[in-house]
Amino acid sequence: MIKILADDRIPFVSELFGDFGELILKPGAHIQNRDLLAVNALLTRSITSVDSALLEGTAVEFVGSATAGFDHIDSTWLKKQSIHWAYAPGANATAVAEYVLHCVAYLHKKNLLPRKSATAAIIGVGHVGCVVSDRLRKIGFTVFHNDPPRAQLEKDFISVPLASLANVDLVCLHTPLVKTGNFPTYHLIDNRFLKMLKPGSVLLNAGRGAVIDNNALLQCDHVITCLDVWENEPTVNLQLLEKTTIATPHIAGYSKQAKLRATLMIYDAFLKYFHLSDTRRFSELQQLQETMTLNIQDGRNAEDILLTLFDPGRESQRMRETLAENPDQFEYLRRHFPLRNEFSAIQLTPTPSALLRKELDDWGFK
């Protein structure tokens, strides 16, 4: 019998993994080495550091992380110990891209971003960056890409140098955090880059906090800042928080569908590793995810609908007020943040007019 220990915040973990052996649920922040001594499979999230301190001397042979990144996993050590591991790359790509669209809608409403002839730069064009690029193009942006590692691997990929991005209206960061090698991203956005940006440009980071030198950003007064990730989080620089136009607690990828997608990806890896057969069909799981019905009032446009679903301005104010009162509440805000529905799971009533339908299609509603 397989013994499985899982983070209790992984959606549908009991429904998917409960039939394959003994399943133990525990908060990810409290998982310790002694919990894993007789455990064969560990299912976790980014809140748990997976390294020698956690796994040395345990029976763990498979690690599945229901996350799009693996900064919290010491993959080198796991490989040396012949411990198989899997994660969920791209699971949250749609959710992050739609977070960016919510921010764009909010910035449009505040007249902080042009609606016509707007330009955007995507720095880091992987799973998430590709989707963000596609969605921005569909609402009229001219999009430039910066991803030197990808350009080195793909001869047809065009990576625009950072120095050529001075005049774009929107800069979106979607790189992993890399501190070594030929293409480090730690403090990629530094004082020099920030000074280069034109006044009134928007800098949006929904990737990794330390890709931006937050101290340099604190001294930058000519750029509109939208941050979902923060250097040194869960500790947030409160002065920087006050300067941001949009501030959220690392929740850009928080959608119901993204969470389910991530669970299914590690579920598939688990089945493959242990040579097991699927006991659930994806269609059955989809039925567990209820769609959301939104009533469209007269006169609403697509941006109004986006901001009804998720208003970055309102959430930013809530974060500022909460952390001003208690700076240690970042993880609490993140843990208890309500999951959004992706646009594909939203039903609009009554049926939109042909004009609104076209507008909604451009923004990604189907």
Curated annotation (Swiss-Prot):
EC number(s) reported in the record: 1.1.1.290
Active site: R208, E233, H250 (proton donor)
Entry binding sites for NAD(+): D147, T175, D228, G253
Sequence positions that bind substrate: S46, T67, Y254
GO cellular component: cytosol
Function recorded in the entry: Catalyzes the oxidation of erythronate-4-phosphate to 3-hydroxy-2-oxo-4-phosphonooxybutanoate.
Annotated protein name in UniProt: Erythronate-4-phosphate dehydrogenase
Organism annotation: Coxiella burnetii (strain RSA 331 / Henzerling II)
Source lineage: Bacteria, Pseudomonadati, Pseudomonadota, Gammaproteobacteria, Legionellales
